[in-house]
Amino acid sequence: MLLVATLLVAGCRGDETSPQSEPDVRGGCGPIEFADVRGEPPSYLETHQLDRFPNDHAVCAGVWLRTGQGFVPQGVVVEGGTAWESGFDGNAPLHERYCILERYDVRTGARLGRLDPVAGQVGDREPLSCRHGGGLVRDHHGLWLVETSRLWLIEPETLDVQRVWALAPPLRGSFSLIDGQQRIGIGRWYPHDPARVDWFDTDQIVGSGVLDITIAMSSGHTAAPRATQGGVWAALGGRPAAPWFAQSVTRCGILAGPEDTRRRAFVPGAEGMDLVGDDSLWVISESGTQHYQRLGGRPVVPQLMRLDVSDFASWRRPDCGV
């Protein structure tokens, strides 16, 4: 568990040698300015100016999250005016980077709730705490929090833990998404190899009575690019709905789709994503967190952004690498 967690945290950094280059100058609802970002600006920022990045013309809104105490957000769900973010405490020692779950009003940036740590137990096994919190999705059962070796079901309003399942190897919870059949995709991150998403029926998980989710319960799998940090099921650029994946390091972001599509430049440090309606793509970025800003040289961008993807077909290609 600790070794995998070490790899996951290292994966969030990746190769930091390829910064984004010139920003986009086309029309759109963005780019937004520093003063447009909702919520209280982090006190640790050394500038009151947002950095530009390619395709930032599509950024319509931003929200500052409370990352001054070390919170590094990884997953996001948005419904109505509320956003839920999962992540970990980046200031803690590596083996103690337990999950944190927060709930925000995206219209004001106010934090509405917090679960820290996320703790529970698999059946009658020993109590434990969640680690990393790499993926977050929601369906009719509630919030599904994916971590390295477990899957958590959490009530959205109270943030109470409902149930916990263990992920049996080779399953690994690095990121997650929900597909058009309402299956949950549990994504495995690898530093140098392609990622993989294994699909599961959540009704089957809840109704089965099992404590361990195994690969045999999967209804299929999807290949994902190397360095995938987050995924979303979306119909982008006039194409049928399919999984799209955020490949990122804190200075670069790339959005990659099906094999016959071209990659697009994306939010630096992009992690989890959630599509609301047809054109509003909410994206978590870890680049603007205290954990990475204090390392120096990372772009200043809001930790939560909403992008208009209505002109996605014309978005620029990436000019940086991960």
Question: Regions from the language model: what does each represent?
Answer:
Residues 8, 12-64, 299-322:
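Sequence/structural signature of beta-propeller modules
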Residues 59-99:
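Beta-strand-rich domains and repeat architectures in extracellular enzymes and scaffolds
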